[in-house]
């Protein structure tokens, strides 16, 4: 992991191409596949931005995160072979919990989908929740970009203007 002093809060960004095998017969990204695109993008972003590989972390420590809740809105279809912009940010962090907001946009910046994902930190061997280490909590506190809206639909209204 990068030194915490070298990390600053930011919205993480990447791009993805909507692939054939992920689409329905109408050439739209299948609703179930949005989660895969969001999670894959987030994992890659965290690895690139913070040099933090969650799979190495899990293998080395026996700890990891499980999804406890997702809220997702599908606003505009993502189309076969379309390039989309993926954004994510940590919006909330507590000792055993993090919430991440992820957005899929077209190349003009228009919102296609919004996801709030909540994760619980767990000891995989004991199947019990566990507090983040001081080092992880310090990282999360440093990179967290809280949002004003605490309700998903209110946030959707703010982001989906125009």
Residue ranges and their predicted role:
Residues 83-85:
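Residue-level marker of beta-strand positions
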């Amino acid at each position: 992991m990068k030194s915490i002093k070298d990390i600053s809060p930011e919205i993480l960004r990447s791009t993805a191409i909507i692939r054939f095998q992920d689409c329905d017969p109408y050439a739209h990204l299948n609703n179930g596949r949005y989660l895969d695109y969001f999670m894959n993008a987030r994992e890659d972003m965290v690895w690139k931005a913070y040099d933090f590989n969650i799979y190495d972390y899990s293998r080395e420590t026996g700890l990891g995160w499980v999804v406890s809740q997702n809220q997702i809105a599908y606003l505009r279809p993502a189309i076969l072979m379309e390039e989309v912009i993926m954004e994510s940010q940590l919006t909330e962090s507590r000792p055993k919990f993090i919430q991440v907001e992820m957005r899929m946009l077209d190349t003009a910046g228009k919102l296609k989908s919004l996801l709030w994902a909540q994760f619980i930190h767990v000891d995989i061997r004991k199947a019990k929740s566990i507090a983040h280490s001081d080092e992880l909590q310090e990282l999360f506190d440093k990179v967290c970009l809280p949002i004003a809206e605490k309700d998903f639909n209110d946030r959707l209204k703010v982001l989906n203007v125009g």
